Amino acid sequence: MKKIAIDLMGGDYAPEEILAGALSFAKENEDVELYLVGIEENFKDVQLPKNCVKVVTDDFLPMDVKPTEAVRRRKSTMYVSCQLAREKKVDAVVSAGNTGALLACATFVVGRIKGIERPTLAVPIPTKNDFCVLADAGANIDVKPSNLLQFAIMGVEYAKLLGKDNPTIGLLNVGTEENKGTQKEKEAFQILKERFGNQFVGNVEGNDLNAGKVDVVVADGFHGNIAMKTMEGAAKMITELIKSEVKKNIISALGALLMKPVFSSLKNKLDPKKYGGTFFIGVEGVVVKAHGNSNRTAIFNALKVAKKGVEEKLPLKIKEALLKCAE
């Protein structure tokens, strides 16, 4: 039976929405044993399904916690969840808590895969065709070219898990020419070209991310996070503009009614809650970061992501890819 720990106190809407999403998932996935890691009051008047295990501690991390503090507070719900993974009592961890704190706990408590310098936060980004994987999306601000190579290796394995065959790779840069960017990007370009051959398409710009030109976009966490947040902001603005325009007159309103299925499909494609969570890849276990503002639906989907990561043996595939790269 697959075993997943969930941090009930991580996220803007903890614990109510986290617990509701977890219980809903447990009821629909009886082949998964869910470890609910929370404080005693989280479980008051709650009837747990038979495949849920209550894990009680007495501390939790605020959303503005520093990563260094996160690894010192060993009784926090996030730390205890990761400790369960370290001790092999669970196969995966899910948390909607602070990103930096979860990265620190994943790295130093769960532990890095041997050979991985920096675990990466890899995020599916919607494109006009389907999606691409962005690695890194904010976990690693200052990186070396060798880190970008490992992000590419891990991003490729994640893209394969999501159904991409022989994923193509692009390096996020300020232009498509080979000589663009800082020395870091120039060196990374040559390393990626040597390692992946034709699988590496070359440099891609920010406006290429949603165009579906590549399956994996490699970036440092600083620029990757800016690109991701810019896309999220643009999608939100477009949605709000459409809502505003259709209310201006009766003709627009009638047209909107006819276009309702199209708008619904578009909203679903752009909704980050659809993916629920994404992986910290490169650690000895499956660790899923759910969005900080996750509701019960997003938590349900984050647990689905974790289950798939366990079923597909993602950490093992990362190890195999690293060995192949070293040959």
From Swiss-Prot:
Subcellular location: Cytoplasm
EC number(s) on file: 2.3.1.274
This protein's GO CC annotations: cytoplasm
Keywords: Cytoplasm, Lipid biosynthesis, Lipid metabolism, Phospholipid biosynthesis, Phospholipid metabolism, Transferase
GO function terms (MF aspect): phosphate:acyl-[acyl carrier protein] acyltransferase activity
Domain of life: Bacteria
SUPFAM superfamilies tied to this protein: Isocitrate/Isopropylmalate dehydrogenase-like
Pathway: Lipid metabolism; phospholipid metabolism
Reactions catalysed: a fatty acyl-[ACP] + phosphate = an acyl phosphate + holo-[ACP]
Gene3D superfamilies, per the entry: Isopropylmalate Dehydrogenase
Pfam families linked to this entry: FA_synthesis
Stated role: Catalyzes the reversible formation of acyl-phosphate (acyl-PO(4)) from acyl-[acyl-carrier-protein] (acyl-ACP). This enzyme utilizes acyl-ACP as fatty acyl donor, but not acyl-CoA.
Protein family per UniProt: Belongs to the PlsX family.
Subunit composition and interactions: Homodimer. Probably interacts with PlsY.
Annotated protein name in UniProt: Phosphate acyltransferase
Species of provenance: Thermosipho africanus (strain TCF52B)
Lineage: Bacteria, Thermotogati, Thermotogota, Thermotogae, Thermotogales
